[in-house]
């Protein structure tokens, strides 16, 4: 794979005009490169950033999503490249990274040949497998497989502890995760971001209707909530859509909400978008730690 050491103004102009010459396409890879130590890595995905950090690698730059701001101590010193959907390509070129990691969802949209002219590019398909698979794939690339296995072992132990704590609260009761925003209500299915951590890692029992959702989430009306018959509800309130807090405040006085089994039994658990929607190794570990703290305070 080609990797340009010098970045010139001509490249910037070529990028803007989308007139780059033909270069080999980048394919998904599990080949091992030299260790990532001292390498300058750019991550075109906040989720891949979380996986890299779980391996002890702090990327030089990252993109993110509007609902996952890169605030917090762990992101200090990392250059912000904008949103993953529309990254700041000029800043990426100026960074002169050694390697780029990108989510397959956005690789074709941004142009793999153009990314490859900047640096060796690794494509990870986050829609295939679970976060453990993604972590292992990245670990193979950066030669940190031992780190990946150690992380997963520690994570599994933490998940077992937190699961036991939660089941003391609800036993084998049915669980539901929902998001409240000014645009409406949604419930999360069995797939990422929340399905795997809740129903696979923590081994909680999903509400039967949750298992029928064949996508990441499904929009619903509040009138549907009683039919879901959840014994416990995880609630996220959108930080992006203005007025979402007011919508949730109004919902809490609604007879439909007040009549829910989980509400009457005080089994509503307020969680936050960061880290719960950060479907990465480090994001999921932080989510477990947040839930553990939440349960200890009840």
Question: In which residue ranges do the predicted regions lie?
Answer:
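Sec-dependent N-terminal signal peptides of Gram-positive bacterial secreted proteins and lipoproteins
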Residues: 1-25
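N-terminal, intrinsically disordered, polar/charged segments of Gram-positive cell-envelope systems
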Residues: 23-40
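Structured C-terminal subdomain patch of bacterial secreted/periplasmic proteins
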Residues: 40, 232-298
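Basic- and aromatic-lined ligand-binding clefts that recognize polyanionic substrates
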Residues: 40-52, 150-205
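A short, structured surface patch at a secondary-structure boundary
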Residues: 45-94, 99, 104
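His/Asp/Glu-enriched short active-site or ligand-binding loop at hydrolase and phosphoryl-transfer sites
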Residues: 66-67, 194-216
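Proline-aspartate-enriched helix->loop->beta-strand connector
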Residues: 96-102, 120, 225, 229-233
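Extracytoplasmic substrate-binding proteins
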Residues: 114-183, 278, 282-298
């Amino acid at each position: 794979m080609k990797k340009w050491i010098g970045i010139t103004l001509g490249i910037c102009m070529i990028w803007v005009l989308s007139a780059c010459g033909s270069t080999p396409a980048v394919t998904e890879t599990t080949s091992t490169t030299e260790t990532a130590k001292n390498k300058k890595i750019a991550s075109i995905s906040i989720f891949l950033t979380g996986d890299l950090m779980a391996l002890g690698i702090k990327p030089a730059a990252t993109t993110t999503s509007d609902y996952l701001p890169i605030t917090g101590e762990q992101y200090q010193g990392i250059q912000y490249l904008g949103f993953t959907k529309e990254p700041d390509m000029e800043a990426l070129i100026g960074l002169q990274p050694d390697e780029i990691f990108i989510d397959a969802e956005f690789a074709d949209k941004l142009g793999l040949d153009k990314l490859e002219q900047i640096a060796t590019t690794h494509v990870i398909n986050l829609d295939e497998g679970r976060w453990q698979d993604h972590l292992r794939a990245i670990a193979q690339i950066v030669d940190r497989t031992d780190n990946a296995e150690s992380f997963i072992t520690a994570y599994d132990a933490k998940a077992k502890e937190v699961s036991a704590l939660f089941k003391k609260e609800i036993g084998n009761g049915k669980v539901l995760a929902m998001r409240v925003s000014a645009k409406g209500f949604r419930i999360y299915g069995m797939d990422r971001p929340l399905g795997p951590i809740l129903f696979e890692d923590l081994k909680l029992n999903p509400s039967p209707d949750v298992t029928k959702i064949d996508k990441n989430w499904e929009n619903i009306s509040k009138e549907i909530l009683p039919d879901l018959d959840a014994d416990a509800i995880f609630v996220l309130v959108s930080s992006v859509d203005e007025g979402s807090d007011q919508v949730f405040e109004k919902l809490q006085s609604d007879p439909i909400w007040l009549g829910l089994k989980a509400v009457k039994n005080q089994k509503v658990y307020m969680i936050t978008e960061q880290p719960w929607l950060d479907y990465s190794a480090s994001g999921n570990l932080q989510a477990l730690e947040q839930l553990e703290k939440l349960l200890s305070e009840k």
